Amino acid sequence: MRKIKVVFVEYQLVCGGAEQALFDLIRLLDKERFEASVFVQTPDGPWEAKFMDAGIPVIHDYDCRKPTFNPVRKLGNFVKKCTVAQAHRREGRGLLEICLPEQPDIVVSYNAWMEREIAFVRGAKCVKYIHGDPGTNPVYRKEATQEQDVLRRYDRIVCVSRAAWNAFRELSGLTQQTELHYNPLNSDNVRSLSGQPVALPDDLPLICAVGRLAEEKGFERLLVIHRHLLDQGIRHRLVIVGDGPDRDFLPRLANALDIQDSVTFTGYQANPYPYMKRSKFLVNSSFTEGLPVIAMEALCLGIPVVSTVPSVGEAFGEEDCGLITDNSVTALEEGIRKMLTDDTFYAKLKAGAENRSVFFDGKRMVKEIEDMFESLMKTT
């Protein structure tokens, strides 16, 4: 049986939740039925090596820019550079046909920052992923309200949370080809890696936050909340796992707030799961997101979640395994305070998270996406 060739198009392989979801998705796809690769628009992302080390082909147009003394290759590179530059001037039209070694069956536009035409390849089906909530994220809102002419050309549009699915359909008016598929989770891998040892103090309750150190993730307000709670005599520690543009600013803020002794910045960790496993609960303080993969990973480990993102509640199912607060400092602070001071309430959510952990079965979750890909190949 011929394998279905799927190319996922990414802007850059950075350390983020969407990229982790893509990594898990490709690793979980049935290798007997699918052959997956990633085309990156911008090279040298910090996670390129992670993908390639896992045997996932990473392709880009930059090979033709490498210096060479071979005159034949140099001429070929010059021609390719010219055609690549022309494709970029046309908003990516024809770029994949130049750069991909083989004709794809399905092209998946996996990132909101892609060039408009890059995913459309003659003879291939096209899928668009919506990771953010257009109801709260201005980038996805603009796309849903102003890019319908491009969006209509996709064979399928996939939203990764019900909140995003509802908002996108309402704002874009595109209901027929829009589907809801949660990001699959490599749950066995998460549970296995969570058992590795990490050096963390255990004298006080530990709160964990994981994500890209960027403004939209709300780590600044989380540090302020941590200070407020300490001032109220609620002793605890905070560990923040991740890297990003605010890597220097956030530790400086911690020093200014005089909380440097109770906050740990681990930097980027290829394996964040032991930090989550050792924590009393996970906090997701983002201003806007789709359905954070890290929240599902925490529940997979039986760790309750406190979040300002409404779509996180979708991961709870029918269990009381976390707390969704209003998207404000005051509300998030009250939620964290309750988790730290109300033992009965916390015990209820901890039990619910442990019950919910069995829901996150990667093989079951990826089957929906495999079925979608196969159904696309049956359409004309």
Region spans (language model):
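A short, active-site helix/loop in glycosyltransferases that binds the activated sugar's phosphate group
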Residues: 116-118, 154-178, 185
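A conserved mid-protein helix/loop that constitutes part of the nucleotide-sugar donor-binding site
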Residues: 16-24, 205, 209-228, 245-252
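Nucleotide-activated donor-binding/catalytic signature segment of Leloir-type glycosyltransferases, i.e.
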Residues: 251-267
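Short His-centered aromatic/hydrophobic patch
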Residues: 91, 108-114, 130
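Conserved acidic donor-binding segment of nucleotide-sugar-dependent glycosyltransferases
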Residues: 318-330, 338-343
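Aromatic "clamp/platform" in nucleotide-sugar-dependent glycosyltransferases that forms part
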Residues: 268, 287
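Acidic anion/phosphate-binding donor-loop and adjacent secondary structure
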Residues: 138-139, 166-170, 179-204, 274
